[in-house]
Amino acid sequence: MGSLWEQESGKTRFESLNHDIKTNVLIIGGGMAGILCAYMLHQSGVPYVLAEAETIGSGITKNTTAKITCQHGLIYDQLIRKFGMERAEQYLKANEDALARYRDLCRNIDCDFEEKDSYVYSLDSRQKIEKEIRALEKLGVHAEAAAHLPLPFSVAGAVRYPKQAQFHPLKFISAVSEGLHIYEHTAVRELAGTEVLTDHGKITAKKIIVATHFPFLNKHGSYFIKLYQSRSYVIALENAPDVHGMYVDEAQTGMSFRNYGSLLLLGGGDHRTG
């Protein structure tokens, strides 16, 4: 099955690497994180190269529901309890700064950027919602509790986080990637010190940023051993109502909702594979 975002955007193409090169910074991975790293280095005048195994935006980026929000579940109560106020404030500020940067970038990009309120709801625990509201108040966020949502089921409660956003990720990437130093169909096969081997060329870099969805190289931490595969699904429904916001269940196996044009994007069904 294809991605709605692929159907709605033009394709930006880049050549593959076929010779040896040297640069200051190598970015491995051409999703949202990698492209934004390349864009910021480009704006700062730092020599860089981005290597993407397939095509830019062809991984997680094209399959996301494309919400831009500081609200990642009921996380702030947990952050304060586990790590303290200072760390929670740092996390919040980093996300607020990122949202502001997206907003500034999208002013001049046709990527269907829309400001929306974001909601995290719970089906069975009003107490969790109240704890999160108190945590956000401590952090200076004007969040509100909501008891009734325009969803096809009742909820115990929800946290409303105002002025978040949604957009079209591939339209955004297509615009931002113009003029960037990118090689597509350039898979990294081996990394040794400051040298990276691809199928048809070697890249020597002073610094290397791995911006892949998971750590594909067996380096410090052996993170690949700790990973497991999971899968979730998103469908685009026609003739569905406008839910006037972005919604996600606080439970890992719950559902998320947002509109795109006349469509309702419904995500859920998260499960481990294998």
What are these regions (language model features)?
Residues 1-25, 43:
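Extreme N-terminal leader/targeting segments of oxidoreductases
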Residues 21-50:
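N-terminal Rossmann-like FAD-binding beta1-loop-alpha1 element of flavoenzymes
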Residues 43-63:
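Glycine-rich FAD pyrophosphate-binding loop
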Residues 46-48, 143, 208:
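Hydrophobic anchor at the start of a short beta-strand
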Residues 71-147:
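Dinucleotide-binding Rossmann-like beta1-alpha1 core, especially the glycine-rich loop
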Residues 108-114, 202-203, 210-274:
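Active-site substrate-recognition segment that forms the wall
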Residues 110-120, 145-175, 269-272:
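Helix-loop-beta segment of a Rossmann-like dinucleotide-binding subdomain
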Residues 134-136, 158-207, 211:
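Helical element adjacent to the flavin cofactor pocket in flavoenzyme catalytic cores
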